């Protein structure tokens, strides 16, 4: 019950923040959840890349191996230059936010609060985790969060126990991670955001540049089939002027985007304790055998010395 209330509260807080925040909320993993049954396509691409077109580095750190029914942490790193600012939805400059999606193997879940160490509680303070869906507890989302405070996102993970879940097997499995900083260039509807380059739809001469609604600019291009008006929202800076000639597809603005998305895979081994104990027993036997050989050799040397050999 407590876990359900916690998840509900986290979802409500995230939803409110997304709806009232200055940045378009679809810039973060939360919105992949609204449009895709799974955040990972058959090709291996995480769907966040459909809206975040720029590629940026994302890193993940996980233990090489874990024991059943133990808590470990996956650290997703979303680095960027904190001195830069992005274009907000209203065209003003604003700080970047970050988000991440972690796709764990089946059986792995978010660790419950009462299983976290004091260190993990401190590292995860202020981070709200949500499941991708009710039937996918192994897929976790975080964000948006202030990037200057959360370039490292810690996910506390509970490893499964094959003894209590027969569908889980020991061995090596993969973790898929996606990390994002900043807003997207395309909305889920396919429309451009104001955080991307705007180009000319036709070739021709620019005959006028006028102001539009909410700080937008309207660029009029005289083409072969008449005038075409290109509406540029507040944010991108115009790089053309009246009298310029442009080709179809030529940039009318700069590229204001300073963020981007990256993904990475990692591997984790669910160790079988019996095999581990067997290995430790074998190593102990080898060590004892070596010690016995050394002692036997010294005993022989003493006997030989006593006999004057």
UniProtKB/Swiss-Prot annotation:
Swiss-Prot/TrEMBL GO biological process terms: photosynthesis
Localization of this protein: Cellular thylakoid membrane
Membrane topology of the entry: Single-pass membrane protein
An example Gene Ontology molecular-function term: iron ion binding
Family matches, as InterPro entries: Cyt-f_TM (IPR024058), Cyt_f (IPR002325), Cyt_f_lg_dom (IPR024094), Cyt_f_lg_dom_sf (IPR036826), Rudment_hybrid_motif (IPR011054)
Transmembrane intervals: 276-296
Keywords: Electron transport, Heme, Iron, Membrane, Metal-binding, Photosynthesis, Signal, Thylakoid, Transmembrane, Transmembrane helix, Transport
Gene3D superfamilies recorded: 2.40.50.100, Cytochrome f large domain, Single helix bin
GO cellular component terms, semicolon-separated: plasma membrane-derived thylakoid membrane
Cofactor note (record): Binds 1 heme group covalently.
Necessary cofactors: heme
Pfam families listed in its UniProt record: Apocytochr_F_C, Apocytochr_F_N
Signal peptide range in chain numbering: 1-27
Residues noted as binding heme in the record, renumbered to the chain: 28, 48, 51-52
NCBIfam families in the record: PRK02693.1
Subunit structure: The 4 large subunits of the cytochrome b6-f complex are cytochrome b6, subunit IV (17 kDa polypeptide, PetD), cytochrome f and the Rieske protein, while the 4 small subunits are PetG, PetL, PetM and PetN. The complex functions as a dimer.
Described purpose of this protein according to its UniProt entry: Component of the cytochrome b6-f complex, which mediates electron transfer between photosystem II (PSII) and photosystem I (PSI), cyclic electron flow around PSI, and state transitions.
The family this protein is said to belong to: Belongs to the cytochrome f family.
Protein name: Cytochrome f
Lineage: Bacteria, Bacillati, Cyanobacteriota, Cyanophyceae, Synechococcales
């Amino acid at each position: 019950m407590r876990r359900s209330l916690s998840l509900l509260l986290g979802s409500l807080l995230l939803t409110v923040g997304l709806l009232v925040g200055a940045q378009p909320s679809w810039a973060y993993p939360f919105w992949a959840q609204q449009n895709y049954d799974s955040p990972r396509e058959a090709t291996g691409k995480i769907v966040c890349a459909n809206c975040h077109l720029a590629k940026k580095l994302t890193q993940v750190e996980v233990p090489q191996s874990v024991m059943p029914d133990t808590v470990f942490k996956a650290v997703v790193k979303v680095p960027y230059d904190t001195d830069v600012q992005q274009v907000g939805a209203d065209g003003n400059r604003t700080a970047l936010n970050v988000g991440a999606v972690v796709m764990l193997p089946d059986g792995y879940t978010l660790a419950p609060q009462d299983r976290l160490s004091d260190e993990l509680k401190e590292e995860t303070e202020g981070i709200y985790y949500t499941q991708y869906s009710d039937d996918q507890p192994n897929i976790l989302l975080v964000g948006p969060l202030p990037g200057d405070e959360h370039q490292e996102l810690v996910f506390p993970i509970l490893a499964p126990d094959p003894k209590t879940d027969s569908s889980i097997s020991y061995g090596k499995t993969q973790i898929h991670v996606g990390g994002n900083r900043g807003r997207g260039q395309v909305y889920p509807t396919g429309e451009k955001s104001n955080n991307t380059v705007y180009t000319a739809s036709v070739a021709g001469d620019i005959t006028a540049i006028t102001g539009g609604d909410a700080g937008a600019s309207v660029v009029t291009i005289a083409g072969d089939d008449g005038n075409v008006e290109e509406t540029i929202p507040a944010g991108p800076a115009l790089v053309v002027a009246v009298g310029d000639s442009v080709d179809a597809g030529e940039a009318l603005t700069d590229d204001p985007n300073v963020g981007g998305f990256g993904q990475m895979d990692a591997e984790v081994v669910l160790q079988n304790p019996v095999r581990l104990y067997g290995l430790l027993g074998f190593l102990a036997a080898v060590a004892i055998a070596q010690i016995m050989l050394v002692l036997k050799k010294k005993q022989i040397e003493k006997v030989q010395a006593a006999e004057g050999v």
